[in-house]
């Protein structure tokens, strides 16, 4: 009985220690969203980033759900190793296309990114690093506002939030420079989901 209690206690302590580390790493990744005017990571003329290398194999059932390329921009993303996820958004000669490098066990995107193209030119990404579904800073909805503005909403988790239910969201307004096709964040605001 005592050895069972010791094992159960040790396991509980290990799980709690890992949970706090996971929460800390999520906060570090999404900290750019805490700035009222985030610094821009997009620069004119940058190439489309390659998909991150993933350890292990991707479940072929998830990969079968990827959208086939339809546009030249889709092909450019595929050439960099990205699977296309969901429908692209377009208007005002702007395209927003989501790509992922991998999937979780429920075929949700892991190591994904949203790419913005303006008049066929790569203008940048909607996050400074690839994101994982159901983690702090995961990109949700993107709304095209005009020919030079879009808004993106990011899920925000506290370490105590269940994975199903982020307690906050951060909306970031992005402008597209007219002189050079480059996407820049101009403001960020966080609100409660309650």
Language-model features, listed with the residues they occupy:
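Bacterial N-terminal signal peptides that target proteins for export
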Residues: 1-9
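Exposed acidic/polar residues on beta-strands and adjacent loops within beta-sheet cores, strongest
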Residues: 21-194
């Amino acid at each position: 009985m005592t050895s069972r209690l010791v094992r159960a206690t040790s396991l509980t302590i290990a799980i709690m220690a890992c949970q706090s580390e996971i929460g800390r790493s999520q906060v570090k990744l999404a900290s750019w969203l805490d700035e009222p005017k985030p610094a821009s990571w997009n620069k004119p003329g940058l190439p489309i980033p390659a998909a991150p290398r993933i350890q292990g194999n991707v479940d072929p059932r998830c990969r079968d759900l990827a959208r086939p390329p339809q546009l030249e921009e889709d092909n450019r993303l595929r050439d960099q190793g990205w699977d296309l996820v969901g429908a692209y958004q377009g208007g005002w000669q702007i395209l927003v296309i989501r790509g992922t490098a991998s999937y979780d066990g429920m075929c949700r995107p892991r190591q994904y990114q949203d790419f913005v193209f303006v008049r066929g030119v790569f203008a940048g990404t909607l996050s400074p690093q690839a994101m994982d579904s159901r983690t702090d800073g995961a990109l949700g909805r993107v709304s095209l506002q005009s020919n030079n503005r879009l808004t993106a909403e990011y899920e925000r988790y506290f370490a105590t939030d269940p994975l199903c239910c982020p307690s906050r969201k951060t909306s970031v307004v992005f402008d597209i420079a007219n002189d050079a096709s480059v996407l820049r964040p101009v403001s960020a605001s966080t609100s409660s989901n309650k």
